[in-house]
Design a protein with these regions (language model features):
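C-terminal tail/sorting-segment detector
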Residues: 18, 609-630
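Subtilisin-like serine protease catalytic core
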Residues: 19-21, 95-192, 199-204, 214, ...
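Substrate-binding/access-modulating region of protease and related hydrolase catalytic domains
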Residues: 21-25, 165-169, 182-275, 306-309, ...
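N-terminal domain-start motif of subtilase-like serine proteases
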Residues: 32-37, 44-126, 146-151, 227, ...
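Catalytic-core environment of secreted peptidases
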Residues: 127-139, 282-343
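Hydrolase catalytic cores
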Residues: 315-384
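Secreted peptidase-domain scaffold signal
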Residues: 394-467, 537-546
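Residue-level detector of functionally pivotal "anchor" positions at catalytic/ligand-binding pockets or at interdomain
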Residues: 540-561, 567, 574
Length: 630
């Protein structure tokens, strides 16, 4: 009897293995509430200190403006650095069709996938320079004000891009037009973000603002600051909560900010955090036929960050976007900027979480899975294959992302796992066609040590990645590596001949794979801080099925009977408690997945006659048994 010790990884059993519980109960059980509360207290102290410094500055400089408009751009003092005010600013200077979100809707609303995913029962937090106009008719009573402050056009436009109904004018329909929205101002955003997941079950938030570059020290360009670290700590602790940040509009400034880098190295602060989705802006795309269909806006800020990470992450339409405004309950207006692209992306995040929850007993995917899914399925953009510092991983494609979730276990793999220290996770996939094989890993990384963030150094290149995971694919003697970019030459094309040591998302693409079995391996560099690292694995292709491996138990730990079976299959074990199971057909496709009942009996009456495999799960372990259905 041969036993194989599993010390490499823990398999997160997808929510389809769990009893159906409410989202709130799930969050209460699976999120570290004590750590979140500690962060809230920390951020509140920082906010109080910052406000005291601002009050002191304006008592000495009463003629200065604390909050004002410059054209259509709202600016407000956020902090005092070396005696000078630093300002936040809004980034405003046919979204659903550009990113194919409309394909997820009901057929009566233009959907083509038969899903009816429109944001029903989903909630989004929108932080902005003011609040949205609650009473706008296109909000239909679905917007709630949390902070009592000024109603603003920008906040109303952003909120509308996410969830406006468009009942009177279809051009105003938001991406997730049946979702609920919470409107808050940006002054204490970090503190409020620590409570939004637990108090309001908000899985996605939008932040269409950032540091105003006018007058800001040049070292801020591309800098990973303490505010970015705070956001990363928050997302790491929250696990299921994913903020979307606008990349910024600094590329068309006159005079230009950071002119030495020719439009690159502009994204900074919270917008440069590792664990968020940073969104750039492009023109409308009516029919994507290839990379040249995606045209960059004149203003969208480009990466890299100072440590060379890929930013923006993705792009969406941000030019000439019509949406709701605050001047009246029926008013609308056209704005442009990464402020308008970001809420389109956030809306897609809501739709994909909704689709996943519909498939998985109302339980959400990890933030890392959602981010990885969006980046994995983005349409190619830019002058060369792979990512770049202008478009990131490309144009969001909600349809493609939804199809990956729908086909999990059939032509795609989506897994949430834990890599243990000094371990390697390995799986194999059977490829049945010559269309591209794509594998990605995504993880929510820990915040770096506080003394490593940038406090005034131009182009500080210290790596901010804490736990560095690496993915590679092998077939025989062939080895395939993920895409990487060279921050020293930001305009150069991406390469795929070495490991990526900067980003917490990695992607391998094999354009013309030979048919056969490929091995996907994930390992890590150095010692994993915390002893392990959760990560998400996404694999897609035209005909990709994960090979079943019997790797966890002794062969005699379980017995399956009768075999062949008619309507009921029984499993008996005297040594291990079975928690859940999956049934696969001979092509490796999942045809059933459920939790175990108290009798360890499985109803197989609906299965067609043939050969099947049942994968049994217990804690960290799994095993596969073959059976025949009469």
């Amino acid at each position: 009897m041969k036993k194989i010790l599993i010390a490499l990884f823990i398999f997160f059993q997808f929510s389809c293995f769990s009893q159906k519980v409410s989202l709130n109960d799930f969050i209460q059980k699976n999120v570290n509430l004590k750590s979140l509360d500690s962060l809230r207290n920390e951020f509140q102290l920082e906010y109080n200190a910052r406000q005291s410094e601002i009050d002191a500055y304006f008592s000495l400089n009463p003629s200065k403006k604390r909050r004002f408009y410059e054209g259509s751009v709202l600016k407000e003092v956020y902090s005092i650095i070396n005696g000078e005010p630093m300002y936040l600013r809004t980034f405003n200077d046919g979204s659903a069709k550009t990113i194919k979100a409309n394909r997820l809707y009901s057929s009566s609303n233009g959907g083509t996938l038969g899903l009816n995913i429109q944001g029903q029962n989903m909630k989004v937090g929108v932080w902005d320079g003011g609040i949205a106009r609650e009473s706008h008719v296109d909000f239909g009573g679905r917007v709630y004000t949390i902070d009592a402050t000024t109603t603003e056009d920008h906040a109303t436009h952003v909120m509308g891009t996410i969830l406006a109904q468009g009942t009177r004018d279809s051009r105003l329909r938001g991406i997730a037009f049946q979702a609920l929205g919470f409107s808050l101002d940006w002054n204490n955003d970090l503190g409020e973000m620590t409570t939004t997941l637990v108090d309001r079950n908000t899985l996605v938030s939008n932040h269409s603002y950032g540091l105003n570059s006018d007058g800001a020290p040049i070292w801020n360009a591309g800098a990973y600051t303490s505010s970015a670290r705070s956001v990363d700590a928050l997302v790491f602790t929250s696990e299921f909560y994913l903020p979307f940040f606008a990349a910024g509009n600094e590329r068309n400034n006159n005079p230009q900010w950071n002119p030495a880098d020719s439009g690159y190295d502009l994204i900074n602060g919270k917008n440069s955090a590792k664990n968020v989705v940073t969104v750039g802006a492009v023109n409308s795309v009516t029919n994507y036929t290839g990379p040249t269909s995606v045209v960059m806006s004149s203003f969208s800020s480009w990466g890299p960050t100072d440590d060379g990470r890929i930013k923006p992450d993705v792009v969406a339409k941000g030019v000439n976007v019509r949406s709701t405004i605050a001047s009246g309950d029926t008013d609308s207006g056209i704005q442009q900027g990464t402020s308008m692209a970001c809420p389109a992306a956030a809306g897609v995040g809501l739709l994909l979480q909704q689709h996943y929850m519909n498939l998985n007993q109302d339980q959400p995917m990890l933030a890392a899975t959602l981010k990885g899914l969006i980046l994995h399925t983005a349409d190619e953009a830019g002058f060369a294959d792979g990512p770049d510092y202008q478009f990131g991983w490309g144009l969001i494609n909600a349809e493609k992302a939804a199809n990956v979730l729908s086909s999990r276990g059939q032509t795609s793999v989506v897994k949430e796992l834990i890599l243990q220290n000094n371990a390697t996770y390995t799986t194999t996939v059977q490829v049945g066609s010559t269309k591209p094989l794509v594998a990605s890993i995504s993880w929510t990384d820990r915040a770096p040590a506080s003394n490593t963030v940038n406090n005034g150094t131009i182009d500080l290149q210290t790596l901010m990645l804490v736990n560095d995971l690496d993915v590679r694919i092998t077939k025989g003697s062939e080895v395939y590596f993920p895409w990487t970019l060279d921050p020293a030459n930001p305009s150069f094309a991406a390469t795929n001949s070495s490991e990526n040591f900067r980003d917490n998302f990695e992607k391998i693409e094999i354009a013309l794979p030979e048919q056969g079995v490929y091995t996907i391996s994930i390992k890590h560099k150095r010692t994993l801080v915390g002893g392990n690292q959760k990560f998400s694995l996404i694999v897609t292709g035209d005909s990709v099925v994960e090979t079943l491996n019997n790797t966890s138990f002794s062969e005699n730990d379980f017995k399956v009977y009768p075999n062949p079976a008619n309507n009921v299959l029984n499993v008996i074990s005297t040594t291990v408690s079975i928690e859940s199971y999956e049934i696969y057909d001979v092509l490796g496709r999942i045809v059933r997945n459920k939790t175990i009942n108290s009798t360890n009996q499985f109803d197989i009456s609906e299965l067609k006659t043939g050969v099947y495999f049942i994968k049994l799960f217990s804690g960290y372990n799994e095993t596969v048994k073959r059976f025949i259905k009469n």
